[in-house]
């Protein structure tokens, strides 16, 4: 809330994002954006494109570019690198077994990084409704969310790392990806 704007974390999907009161900007990893939820109460690429064009125009008048703005944001808040991993399964019950196993016997490390904490999203967390999934925090500002897909026989894993640069984030994601897939398979 660096700019005195509230931040709200919700479950995946615009049915949850659109419920945020006075939403200024919402997005999900599946490339969906909302910038004018009063007009369009769902993801809306057209409004997002118009909004981005207005920002670019304003920056140009100041002699700046979108890249300049992004570099300023990354310098202030770090570069947030993200990746989604999908692990296909023969049947959904194997995901339930894995998640229940992690709940009963949490790991002390994943991909060589100490596990700082695990939030069981089946219990209400931070005002979120319960959902089947785990939010795992690793040393080094690394967040992993593991949940079953809502539409396919697969487990979805969302990784977020925060570093100083894009290259550092990509390197860290590369280091985590393989061991995480092996751990969860």
Regions found by a protein language model. Give the residues of each.
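Phosphate-binding and adjacent anionic-ligand microenvironments
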Residues: 1-148, 154-158, 165-173, 177-185
